[in-house]
A protein has these predicted regions:
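Ordered, amphipathic secondary-structure segments that act as subunit-interaction surfaces
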Residues: 78-91, 98
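Helix-start/capping segments and mature chain N-termini
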Residues: 1-75, 92, 98-287
Length: 287
């Protein structure tokens, strides 16, 4: 595959960064993942805004130009012979001394990765998937709020735990906070419906302020749905009428069963997709 590094296209085996890049040494870097539709990156402005704000917090001098990024993505689609793709835009701090940083990073590295979108499993959107409760808690944010940073060990350990549950193949893993509140999935934000109100964990839990999470809330409110964020527990999920998860690539995925770490299974909405989730999926398709 071809990728973009600092505005230039390279074959993936030719694109390298220094061993003194603080993204490699200390995990000082941020990234955004999103997809294209008809060759156009979806919600690019929102992703770049989050990326820019995070870079400011980390002292990384990076202010992306949306038109330039969109053009690079278009070139990558063309050279890789893809109509649409999964995109990862990464910004690492750049080269500095071996030691804890303190100053401004003025020469960050920008890397745009691209790969084919996973095949769309229509059965998931018509029948739903499972959500597995994990023992591993969600770690606390690195700063005042959670960055989409290179620090991904918590998610990787969660993925390893999920793979140990033989009954939950294909499921998403759900993490709680240390205090036992609902947090988020390994690669998704969580929603549930109770009494026709769409609920989602508050950002006060330390979850990622997901771009698709925000978009779905706006989409729901614009179409007359009631929404609410707050501090919720596992029992709230068990008593919910519907559950769904969201991310930028999978969009809105309905959940029709829950599993505990000891393998106990609970059906959601009698094992079928609820009307609100189904309606939001259709609305998302048409935007």
């Amino acid at each position: 595959m071809w990728i973009s590094m600092n505005g230039q296209l390279y074959k993936e085996e030719q694109a390298v960064v220094s061993v003194y890049d603080h993204g490699f040494l200390y995990g000082l870097g941020l990234f955004e993942t999103f997809r294209t539709y008809a060759g156009k990156p979806f919600l690019l402005q929102e992703h770049l805004l989050r990326l820019t704000e995070g870079c400011k917090e980390l002292g990384i001098a990076y202010e992306p130009n949306m038109e330039r990024i969109a053009e690079q993505i278009s070139k990558l689609l063309e050279v890789n012979e893809l109509q649409d793709a999964y995109i990862r835009l990464s910004v690492s701090a750049g080269v500095d001394i071996l030691g804890l940083p303190g100053g401004l990073y003025e020469q960050p590295n920008e890397i745009i990765y691209i790969k084919s979108l996973p095949p769309r499993d229509e059965a998931v959107y018509s029948q739903g998937k499972a959500l597995q409760l994990l023992k591993l808690p969600r770690n606390t944010p690195e700063g005042l709020y959670r960055f989409k940073s290179f620090h991904y060990m918590n998610n990787i350990l969660a993925k390893r735990e999920l793979q140990n549950y033989r009954w939950s193949a294909g499921a998403e893993g759900l993490m709680l906070t240390e205090e036992g509140y609902l947090a988020e999935g390994i690669v998704s934000n969580l929603f549930f419906v109770k009494n026709d109100v769409i609920c989602t964990p508050s950002l006060d839990t330390g979850i990622l302020p997901g771009i698709t999470r925000s978009y779905v809330l706006q989409l729901a409110e614009a179409n007359g749905f009631s929404t609410q964020d707050g501090l919720y527990r596992w029992e709230d999920l068990l008593q919910s009428d519907e559950i769904f998860i969201v991310n930028s690539v999978q969009e809105i995925v309905p959940i029709t069963s829950l599993y505990t770490p000891d393998g106990q299974k609970y059906l959601v909405s009698h094992g079928s997709i609820g009307p609100i989730a189904r309606g939001l999926i259709e609305l998302y398709k048409t935007t």
